[in-house]
Design a protein with these regions (language model features):
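Short, well-ordered coil/turn segments that N-cap beta-strands
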Residues: 1-2, 37-39, 65-72, 91-93, ...
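Active-site mouth loops of central-metabolism enzymes
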Residues: 4-26, 71-80, 106-116, 138
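Non-cysteine beta-strand/loop elements that form the S-adenosyl-L-methionine
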Residues: 5-7, 92-103
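Conserved, mostly hydrophobic/aromatic
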Residues: 12, 32, 95, 137
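Catalytic domains of carbohydrate-active enzymes, especially glycoside hydrolases
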Residues: 25-46, 86-94
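Glycine-rich, proline-tolerant flexible connector loops at the mouths of alpha/beta enzymes
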Residues: 37-63, 75, 99-112, 138
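Alpha-helix-loop-beta-strand connector modules within alpha/beta enzyme cores
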Residues: 49-78, 116-133
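Hydrophobic alpha-helical hairpins/lids featuring a short glycine-rich hinge
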Residues: 86, 96, 102-138
Length: 138
């Protein structure tokens, strides 16, 4: 089965120079999920700003009412529980966990041994499971 995951609403390099207001994110998410049949929508990166948090809360509230909550995803980081706390507080239930896949990234960017990064990932995934937050690893 092929699924479409849209990242338009996650402000950042994929939409360089573009930042959506909360009402715009809500309208776009509604069109993507209801009208275009997109399977999954990544709506934000965790911990970006207070404005982003409020936008995610607004979209998540609509998604919960309309049966689309499991289709909303938020990019999170291997940061203990910080991203999970943000995502859960915003009302979302799916984290796309950004993990490093190359030795160079782990050792030079994170300054960790690969085993430590794997342990850190495991810690986040286990905590997410306790909170009933689904995890996709990237």
């Amino acid at each position: 089965m092929i699924e479409i995951m849209d990242t338009t609403l996650r402000d950042g390099e994929q939409t360089s120079g573009v930042s959506f207001a909360a009402h715009e994110k809500l309208s776009i998410a509604q069109v993507l999920l209801n009208d275009l049949g997109v399977n999954r929508v990544e709506i934000a990166s965790a911990r970006v700003s207070d404005g982003e948090f409020e936008a995610v809360k607004r979209v998540a509230a609509w998604a919960a009412r309309s049966g689309n909550l499991d289709k909303l995803e938020v990019l999170g980081f291997v940061d203990g529980t910080v991203s999970l706390d943000w995502i859960e507080s915003a009302g979302c239930r799916v984290v796309n966990l950004l993990c490093k896949g190359s030795y160079k990234h782990v050792t030079e960017q994170l300054r960790k041994a690969p085993e430590q990064h794997v342990d850190d990932i495991r810690t986040v995934v286990l905590e997410a499971a306790k909170r009933k937050i689904d995890v996709n690893i990237y």
